[in-house]
């Protein structure tokens, strides 16, 4: 015993060795119990049966872990309604669309997978592949075009059946589908838009190329400057872990107002794992009877399934094709010559041509963008934007370190 009644150094070391030994014995017992539980009951020896009886707490813990793993696995599985069931559900959804006084659509990455832009949590999603240690790739994002779902939403808005669209997507495809900017809230930004935050109000620059080449988490300067004040421009992307503060294109004010007025919400292609964290979108302060009716289209489980009036297990394009048929509405075909981005875009100034190396959009696939001598139809390695690729790289690095 050391002076003053405390333990001596050798006594502390001995106590630490005893603690570590007990922990190792507990881990070994846990491994033994786990191996026994993997066997069928008829295959267990009498000694193994006694060990399980003496380790009720460990058995309970391991069985609980197994149930949780199975539950998570089931939630990640994609489920498809059979064709007849899906048609029945779409008829019900069509009735809800017709009778809605204020319908708001929430969209996620699942509506853009048909444009070869991967989602995040599907079987071939970004996070899913990274968790498995597999590489992530995507087609050049400048080649993506609005999907059948994007064009259907635009037609529904034209017909005043949809009042507002709230999107998590950064791909700019809602804007390019012809949806008015006042009708969109791009909560996580738009890869084609950079802004000057020194100008009041903020000055926006819509481009025909991905502006996020040099940007990443907490690094948003694009390398170009404002035509009016000369301040460095920044992208509009809200990365995971960031809080969006820009007025546009996030348009939170309109999203909140639309949600407060909504009597019906249609969620398309979103896991809702991020959107559920935005309480302003769900009117949870209202009594249950006054909350909007929720309709969800997704192949996987979502945390809002229990709140939904109807869950449709199907691909967004398939569901929207059936819905538009049921409503008797023709789906417009996307035409690059009519893409609004070309009339909204601000051209680069002299000397800015080398400020990016991304392929620019052009009205025709045969037409090479100014300064672009490459063959637009030639195959090229996939290019990931800063909003997309940098996040993938960070996740992969964390996975490798772990």
Swiss-Prot record:
Binding positions (NAD(+)): 108-127, 168-171, 269-271, 298-300, 316
CDD domains on file: SIRT7
GO biological process: DNA repair; DNA repair-dependent chromatin remodeling; homologous chromosome pairing at meiosis; negative regulation of gene expression, epigenetic; negative regulation of phosphatidylinositol 3-kinase/protein kinase B signal transduction; negative regulation of protein ubiquitination; negative regulation of transcription by RNA polymerase II; osteoblast differentiation
Phenotype upon gene inactivation: Mice show a reduction in lifespan and develop heart hypertrophy. The mean and maximum lifespan is reduced by 59% and 55%. Mice develop kyphosis and lose subcutaneous fat early in life; they also show a general decrease in stress-resistance mechanisms. Mice suffer from degenerative heart hypertrophy and inflammatory cardiomyopathy. Hearts are also characterized by an extensive fibrosis.
Post-translational modification: Phosphorylated during mitosis. Methylation at Arg-390 by PRMT6 inhibits the H3K18Ac histone deacetylase activity, promoting mitochondria biogenesis and maintaining mitochondria respiration.
Reaction(s) the record says it catalyses: N(6)-acetyl-L-lysyl-[protein] + NAD(+) + H2O = 2''-O-acetyl-ADP-D-ribose + nicotinamide + L-lysyl-[protein]; N(6)-glutaryl-L-lysyl-[protein] + NAD(+) + H2O = 2''-O-glutaryl-ADP-D-ribose + nicotinamide + L-lysyl-[protein]; N(6)-succinyl-L-lysyl-[protein] + NAD(+) + H2O = 2''-O-succinyl-ADP-D-ribose + nicotinamide + L-lysyl-[protein]; N(6)-propanoyl-L-lysyl-[protein] + NAD(+) + H2O = 3''-O-propanoyl-ADP-D-ribose + nicotinamide + L-lysyl-[protein]
SUPFAM superfamilies, alphabetized: DHS-like NAD/FAD-binding domain
Residue list for modification Asymmetric dimethylarginine: 390
Cofactor remark: Binds 1 zinc ion per subunit.
Region (Disordered), start-end ranges: 1-23, 355-402
Means of activity regulation: NAD-dependent protein-lysine deacetylase and deacylase activities are activated by nucleic acids. Histone deacetylase activity is activated by DNA. Protein-lysine deacylase activity is activated by RNA. H3K18Ac histone deacetylase activity is inhibited by methylation at Arg-390. H3K18Ac histone deacetylase activity is inhibited by deubiquitination by USP7.
Modified residues (Omega-N-methylarginine): 390
Any GO CC annotation of this UniProt entry: nucleolus
Pfam families linked: SIR2
Superkingdom of source: Eukaryota
Ubl conjugation found in the keyword field: yes
Alphabetical list of Gene3D superfamilies matching this protein: 2.20.28.200, TPP-binding domain (3.40.50.1220)
Binding of Zn(2+), residues: 196, 199, 226, 229
UniProt KW keywords: Chromatin regulator, Chromosome, Cytoplasm, DNA damage, DNA repair, Metal-binding, Methylation, NAD, Nucleus, Phosphoprotein, Repressor, Transcription, Transcription regulation, Transferase, Ubl conjugation, Zinc
Active site positions, chain numbering: 188 (proton acceptor)
GO-annotated molecular function: chromatin binding; histone H3K18 deacetylase activity, NAD-dependent; metal ion binding; NAD+ binding; NAD-dependent protein lysine deacetylase activity; NAD-dependent protein-lysine depropionylase activity; protein methyltransferase activity; protein-glutaryllysine deglutarylase activity
Compartment(s) of residence: Nucleus, Nucleolus; Nucleus, Nucleoplasm; Chromosome; Cytoplasm
Record text on subunit structure and interactions: Interacts with UBTF and the RNA polymerase I complex. Interacts with components of the B-WICH complex, such as MYBBP1A, SMARCA5/SNF2H and BAZ1B/WSTF. Interacts with ELK4, leading to stabilization at target promoters for H3K18Ac deacetylation. Interacts with histone H2A and/or histone H2B. Interacts with DNMT1. Interacts with SIRT1.
PANTHER family registered for this protein in UniProt: NAD-DEPENDENT PROTEIN DEACETYLASE SIRTUIN-7 (PTHR11085:SF1), NAD-DEPENDENT PROTEIN DEACYLASE SIRTUIN-5, MITOCHONDRIAL-RELATED (PTHR11085)
Function: NAD-dependent protein-lysine deacylase that can act both as a deacetylase or deacylase (desuccinylase, depropionylase and deglutarylase), depending on the context. Also acts as a dedecanoylase. Specifically mediates deacetylation of histone H3 at 'Lys-18' (H3K18Ac). In contrast to other histone deacetylases, displays strong preference for a specific histone mark, H3K18Ac, directly linked to control of gene expression.
Protein name in UniProt: NAD-dependent protein deacetylase sirtuin-7
Gene that specifies this protein: Sirt7
């Amino acid at each position: 015993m050391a002076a003053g009644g405390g333990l001596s150094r050798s006594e502390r070391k001995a106590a630490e060795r005893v603690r570590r030994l007990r922990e190792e014995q507990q881990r070994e017992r846990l491994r033994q119990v786990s191996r026994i539980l993997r066997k069928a009951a008829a295959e267990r020896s009498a000694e193994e049966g006694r060990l399980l009886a003496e380790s009720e707490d460990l058995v309970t813990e391991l069985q609980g872990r197994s149930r949780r793993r199975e539950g998570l696995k089931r939630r990640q599985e994609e489920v498809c309604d059979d064709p007849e069931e899906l048609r029945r559900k779409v008829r019900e959804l069509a009735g809800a669309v017709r009778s809605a006084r204020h319908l708001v659509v929430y969209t996620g990455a699942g509506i853009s997978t048909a444009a070869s832009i991967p989602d995040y949590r599907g079987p071939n999603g970004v996070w899913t592949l990274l968790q498995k240690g597999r590489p992530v790739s995507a087609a050049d994002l400048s080649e993506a075009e609005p999907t059948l779902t994007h064009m259907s939403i635009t037609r529904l808005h034209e017909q005043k059946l949809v009042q507002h669209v709230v999107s998590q997507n950064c791909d700019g495809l809602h804007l390019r589908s012809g949806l008015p900017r006042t009708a969109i809230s791009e909560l996580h930004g738009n890869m084609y838009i950079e802004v000057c935050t020194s100008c009041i109000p903020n000055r926006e620059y819509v481009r025909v190329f991905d502006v996020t080449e040099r940007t990443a988490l907490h690094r948003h300067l694009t390398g170009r400057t404002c035509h009016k004040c000369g301040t460095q421009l920044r992208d509009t992307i809200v990365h995971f872990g960031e809080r969006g503060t820009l007025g546009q294109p996030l348009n939170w004010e309109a999203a909140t107002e639309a949600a407060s007025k909504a009597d019906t919400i249609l969620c398309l292609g979103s896991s809702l794992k991020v959107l559920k964290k935005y309480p302003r979108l769900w009117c949870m302060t209202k009594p249950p009877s006054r909350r909007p009716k929720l309709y969800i289209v997704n192949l996987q489980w979502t945390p809002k399934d229990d709140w939904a009036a109807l869950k449709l297990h199907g691909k967004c394009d398939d569901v929207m094709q059936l819905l538009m048929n049921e409503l008797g509405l023709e789906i417009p075909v996307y035409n690059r010559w009519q893409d609004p981005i070309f009339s909204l875009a601000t051209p680069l100034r002299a000397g800015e041509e080398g400020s990016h190396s991304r392929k620019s959009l052009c009205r025709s696939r045969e037409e090479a963008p100014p300064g672009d001598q490459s063959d637009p139809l030639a195959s090229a390695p996939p290019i990931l934007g800063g909003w997309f690729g940098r996040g993938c790289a960070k996740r992969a690095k964390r996975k490798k370190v772990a």
